[in-house]
């Protein structure tokens, strides 16, 4: 769950994943 499992969020926040 969270940003890292959300593709749209993940591409905008690569540093936290």
UniProtKB/Swiss-Prot annotation:
One of its GO terms (molecular function) is acetylcholine receptor inhibitor activity. PROSITE patterns: ALPHA_CONOTOXIN. Expressed by the venom duct. Its main location: secreted. Keywords: Acetylcholine receptor inhibiting toxin, Amidation, Disulfide bond, Neurotoxin, Postsynaptic neurotoxin, Secreted, Toxin. The modification Cysteine amide is found at residue 17. Disulfide bonds join 3-9, 4-17. It comes from the Eukaryota. Residues 5-7 are annotated as: Ser-Xaa-Pro motif, crucial for potent interaction with nAChR. Belongs to the conotoxin A superfamily. The cysteine framework is I (CC-C-C). Alpha4/7 pattern. This is Alpha-conotoxin LsIA. The lineage of its organism: Eukaryota, Metazoa, Spiralia, Lophotrochozoa, Mollusca.
């Amino acid at each position: 769950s969270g940003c890292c499992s959300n593709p749209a969020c993940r591409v905008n926040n690569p540093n936290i994943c």
